[in-house]
């Protein structure tokens, strides 16, 4: 297994680690500990960086593989969807936003698996809108977890601004997610039609 694919697997492994720290505390409760959100934010930021790094190295070293094309967006989905579920728990992410994200991910993942299981074994890579969507999602999540940690520190106003920004970014994420999903299905409509 090459290095870019190892980085992708590392991102998947970091998902349950992120979940552990976010689950240790909850904003709005008496025993809320911002340190755990800070640690979770650092873990998420590190995992997000591997998303940039694995793609960059795969292209630079000509190590693009079918596994990478399939596993890289899957790792992104796991990481960001889990984070948004916890943001919903905290009251920052609207259920509407999460439903749009889940609907898009299920539809696109279903299409990818269907294409991979077809006779020609086609692997559908992420498109530009999918990458824009992922970057927006990751920035929103990073703003939220670091912002939440700061609201209980010495930089209350900066932290509050970050949390406020992350709330509105969630809606921007919903728009980008919907557009990327529609474009993805449209670009692969020929496969969808033949699969009927």
Where do the PLM segments sit?
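Alpha-helical transmembrane bundles and membrane-interface segments of multipass inner-membrane proteins
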Residues: 1-196
């Amino acid at each position: 297994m090459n290095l870019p694919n190892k980085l992708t697997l590392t991102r998947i492994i970091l998902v349950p680690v992120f979940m552990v720290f976010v689950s240790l505390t909850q904003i709005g409760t008496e025993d809320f500990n911002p340190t755990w959100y800070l640690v979770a934010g650092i873990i998420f930021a590190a995992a997000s960086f591997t998303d940039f790094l694995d793609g960059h190295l795969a292209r630079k070293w000509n190590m693009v593989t079918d596994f990478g094309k399939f596993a890289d967006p899957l790792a992104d989905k796991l990481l960001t969807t889990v984070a948004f579920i916890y943001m919903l728990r905290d009251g920052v992410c609207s259920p509407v936003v999460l439903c749009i994200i889940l609907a898009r991910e299920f539809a696109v993942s279903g299409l990818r698996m269907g294409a991979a299981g077809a006779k020609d074994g086609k692997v559908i890579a992420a498109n530009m809108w999918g990458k824009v969507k992922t970057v927006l999602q990751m920035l929103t999540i990073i703003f939220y977890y670091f912002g939440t940690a700061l609201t209980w520190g010495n930089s209350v106003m900066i932290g509050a601004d970050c949390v406020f920004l992350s709330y509105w970014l969630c809606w921007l994420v919903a728009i980008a997610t919907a557009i990327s999903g529609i474009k993805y299905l449209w670009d692969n409509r020929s496969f969808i039609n033949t699969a009927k």
